[in-house]
Swiss-Prot record:
GO terms for cellular component: nucleus; transcription regulator complex. Pfam families: HLH. Induction: By SHH. Gene3D superfamilies: Helix-loop-helix DNA-binding domain (4.10.280.10). Promotes formation and maturation of oligodendrocytes, especially within the brain. Cooperates with OLIG2 to establish the pMN domain of the embryonic neural tube. One of its GO terms (biological process) is neuron fate commitment. It comes from the Eukaryota. PANTHER family: BASIC HELIX-LOOP-HELIX PROTEIN NEUROGENIN-RELATED, OLIGODENDROCYTE TRANSCRIPTION FACTOR 1. Residues 94-153 form the bHLH domain. GO terms for molecular function: DNA binding; DNA-binding transcription factor activity; protein dimerization activity. The gene is Olig1. This is Oligodendrocyte transcription factor 1. Coiled coil: none annotated.
Length: 260
């Protein structure tokens, strides 16, 4: 009798396990496993849920779910790239500061040079005298005024030489030779400095004529390595400093040319 009941339980266990269980039904297979002594090993809920979810998902979806776990390893190269970008930006800022400082210094030097040129040119500028006293000339106007002033000085020098050559007689060659070194020796004090130009009577040809007549004639000394046709050195008081006098422009040659 007992053997028949137990055999019926064993035969009915698979059917009971396969059949959906209802509330209130007793699972016969569990009591059979307890009688035999079999116990199922404990499984954590998280691992069981993840394994069951992973087993239910298809293979591509499983790979996508595992991919985000490997992403946190990427911040190290990203931080290095950000550091390199910050360093490059800092270098560009330093280079920009150097360029700006160099350009600022260049403009300051240009402004100082223009101010110095205005101090020399403006006393001789009629436009500046007619204009407002506090008005400052632009850079282009200052350069154009300086160009015209230099041309005026050159023409004045040529007129002075022509006047001295026409009315000085035999002393004209000496004045022609000595005129350029005299005016070129100190251009700042003779021609450019404000107030250095004296009254008109001090610039008359008679002053230079008397100076040329009082001084001894130009002495030409041959250079040590030169021959008969080599240039000589003029060291007279009119010339103020020694300079080369070519043989073709000696005193005798110039006098002969003007006597024709």
């Amino acid at each position: 009798m007992y053997y028949a009941i137990s055999q019926a339980r064993v035969n009915a266990a698979p059917a009971t396990m396969l059949r959906p269980q209802r509330p209130g039904d007793v699972q016969l297979g569990a009591s059979l496993y307890e009688l035999v002594g079999y116990r199922q090993p404990p499984i954590s809920s998280s691992s069981s849920s993840s394994s069951s979810t992973a087993s239910l998902l298809p293979k591509p979806a499983r790979e996508k779910a595992e991919a985000p776990l490997a992403e946190p390893r990427g911040p190290a190269p990203e931080s290095g790239g950000a550091r390199a970008d910050a360093k490059e930006e800092q270098q560009q800022q330093q280079l920009r500061r150097k360029i700006n400082s160099r350009e600022r210094k260049r403009m300051q030097d240009l402004n100082l040079a223009m101010d110095a040129l205005r101090e020399v040119i403006l006393p001789y500028s009629a436009a500046h005298c007619q204009g407002a006293p506090g008005r400052k000339l632009s850079k282009i106007a200052t350069l154009l005024l300086a160009r015209n002033y230099i041309l005026l000085l050159g023409s004045s020098l040529q007129e002075l030489r022509r006047a001295l050559g026409d009315g000085a007689g035999p002393a004209a060659p000496r004045l022609l030779l000595a005129g350029l070194p005299l005016l070129a020796a100190a251009p700042g004090s003779v021609l450019l400095a404000p107030g250095a130009v004296g009254p008109p009577e001090t610039l008359r040809p008679t002053k230079y004529l008397s100076l040329a007549l009082d001084e001894p004639p130009c002495g030409q000394f041959s250079l040590p390595a030169g021959g008969a046709g080599s240039p000589g050195l003029c060291s007279c008081a009119v010339c103020k400093f020694p300079h080369l006098v070519p043989a073709g422009l000696g005193l005798a040659a110039v006098q002969a040319q003007f006597s024709k």
